[in-house]
Amino acid sequence: MSAKKTKKGKKEKDQDLINFMINGQPVQAKKGWTVLETARQYGIQIPTLCFHPAVEAIGSCRLCVVEILQNGRSRVAASCITPVQGGVEVLTDSEEVLNVRRWILEMLLANCPASHQIRALAKEHGVTSTRFTVEHPEDACARCGLCTRACDEVVGVRAISLGNRGVFKEVTAPYHQRSTECIRCGTCLYVCPTGAMEYLFPQVSAP
């Protein structure tokens, strides 16, 4: 292969990459990558709860928020579902981001106070209490849907789902009975980020 063709191939390859900044560091990403994917490629840590690379991201927990600066404007977005854009600057630990993240962790402390993982994550961010009402002190489920998505997308069974809405949302099996579709593979236990499936699994898994 000639040097001319090699240079042309490299140029075309470079044109497929998107250039932007994360925390002042120049980065490159492939078209279709998210901000979170790119950050992880460069070893930049962004906390997540509902994200797992094996399933489609939905950005439900919002813990992975980042600040995006573009054309003199700023916005906060969930990095796991935000595609990269050329020329923008992303901040993963700005004061705006940290304030939003702390507020989310306060909400999580109120919604799933029994989760050791949530309490540890909150403590890392300086959150040791919540201003919100704790309705169920024994609850550890964040309703992130990671377990149900893994059951559907990875296992292909759909043995469990998120039932009800709002504050009544819960991980359940059809008709609120133990699932006859469950193959007891334990995938939901493995991906659960809060430890809630440890007590939910016996309630929803196959008899």
Write out the residue ranges for each language-model feature.
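Fe-S ferredoxin-like electron-transfer domains
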Residues: 3-8, 62, 66, 72-184, ...
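Aromatic-flanked redox-active Cys/Sec active sites in thiol-based oxidoreductases
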Residues: 24, 52, 138
